[in-house]
Amino acid sequence: MTKIFRKSNPLNKMINSSLIDLPSPSNISYLWNFGSLTGLCLALQIISGLLLTMHFSPSINLAFDSTVHIVRDVYGGWFIRNVHISGASLFFTCMFIHIGRGIYYGSFKNLKTWYSGVILFILSMLTAFLGYVLPWGQMSFWAATVITNLLSAVPMMGGTLVETVWGGYSVGDPTLKRFLVLHFLMPFSMIAVSLIHLVFLHETGSNNPMGINPNMDKIPFHPYLSFKDILGFSFLLTFLITFSLLLPYLTTDPDNFSPANSMVTPPHIKPEWYFLFAYSILRAIPNKLAGIIALVMSLSVLLLMPILIRSNKRSMTFMPLMQVTFWLMVCNFIFLSWLGAMPLEPPFILMSQISSFIYFFIFFVMFPLISRNEDKILEFHAMYS
């Protein structure tokens, strides 16, 4: 009776084909859990964000005080805000691992799935930036001023764009209200893109660590892989609650505990840690327009992955040179993030420029050359062995 019910009702049939009877490769590892963990983080962010919005006042005179009110006076408000702060860091941690797994195991060859995922990543970055401005602390205000002012580098219409975003001649009350509206609405657009991402994924099927055709050996998603996801959920929730209770402000900037003051510039303006790699690339180039182009390319380079890596093999599992290049890219990414948190002074300026060059050199030169040459080396070895 249960089997008939979940396959006869149209809604249940859709859920059944996506979560229960979905044919999945039998050898996928826990690295494949980070997609569902990212989805769980998104759900937690939306729920906690809705609760915070009920007590938030989008006014430059009240925003900081309403944030203090949430923490001090609202029942459980401190915990909800801590979950929202820590959840953002955990969300991007899961997303970075998810993207890294996609590069390592060649998931970018599912073009529709990959492109929808990159769009989701860019939307996440924009949403997080908008949310960072809302508490209207000192770092929030100056981050909004610096980042939105980058639009002025757009030829012909830069000044008009900046004033449109600001709602005036400087960052102020209209800016805060616009950012709240966009920060409230964009997560729902992210849900839509996530569903599109899932539809495309289920159309082609998941990849596997071996990089071979998975159709030879598939198992139903439930109960085998669903229990792996549930285990991942339990670990993530445990870590999130522990982090929110013990180290809630580890990733925040101390300057943001002071109200915004347009007359005092912080000695070092920096965004949250998950923006630091792109921020470091932006600062490494003295020219504003060139820096913005490099910033955009640091994210949109993911869209070019299917073109840049043209190997006959899907996964890097059997490509040792590509593995070395991949981990070099990961180390450089971490190094760039560290440099983004440093003051803009020697020797960090030169180090940022070198690390930014390495970042693009890996993607545009090393990945294409090594992927093609490693194929030829393996073919030569197979021919004469």
From Swiss-Prot:
Gene Ontology terms for molecular function: metal ion binding; ubiquinol-cytochrome-c reductase activity
Protein's gene: MT-CYB
Record-linked Gene3D superfamilies: Cytochrome Bc1 Complex, Chain C
Binding site for heme b b566: H98, H197
Assembly and oligomerization: The cytochrome bc1 complex contains 3 respiratory subunits (MT-CYB, CYC1 and UQCRFS1), 2 core proteins (UQCRC1 and UQCRC2) and probably 6 low-molecular weight proteins.
Gene Ontology cellular-component annotations: mitochondrial inner membrane; respiratory chain complex III
Required cofactor(s): heme b
Binding positions for a ubiquinone per the UniProt entry: H202
Subcellular location: Mitochondrion inner membrane
Binding, heme b b562: H84, H183
GO BP annotations, alphabetical order: mitochondrial electron transport, ubiquinol to cytochrome c
One Pfam family this sequence matches: Cytochrome_B
Topological type in the membrane: Multi-pass membrane protein
Highest taxon listed in the record's lineage: Eukaryota
Family: Belongs to the cytochrome b family.
Major subcellular site: mitochondrion
Protein name stated in the entry: Cytochrome b
Transmembrane segments: 34-54, 78-99, 114-134, 179-199, 227-247, 289-309, 321-341, 348-368
InterPro entries in UniProt: Cyt_b/b6_C, Cyt_b/b6_C_sf, Cyt_b/b6_N, Cytb/b6-like_sf, Cytochrome_b, Cytochrome_b_C_euk/bac, Cytochrome_b_N_euk/bac, Di-haem_cyt_TM
Lineage summary: Eukaryota, Metazoa, Chordata, Craniata, Vertebrata
Record flagged with keyword Mitochondrion: yes
Extra facts: Heme 1 (or BL or b562) is low-potential and absorbs at about 562 nm, and heme 2 (or BH or b566) is high-potential and absorbs at about 566 nm.
Record keywords, A-Z: Electron transport, Heme, Iron, Membrane, Metal-binding, Mitochondrion, Mitochondrion inner membrane, Respiratory chain, Transmembrane, Transmembrane helix, Transport, Ubiquinone
SUPFAM superfamilies documented for this protein: a domain/subunit of cytochrome bc1 complex (Ubiquinol-cytochrome c reductase), Transmembrane di-heme cytochromes
Cofactor, free-text remark: Binds 2 heme b groups non-covalently.
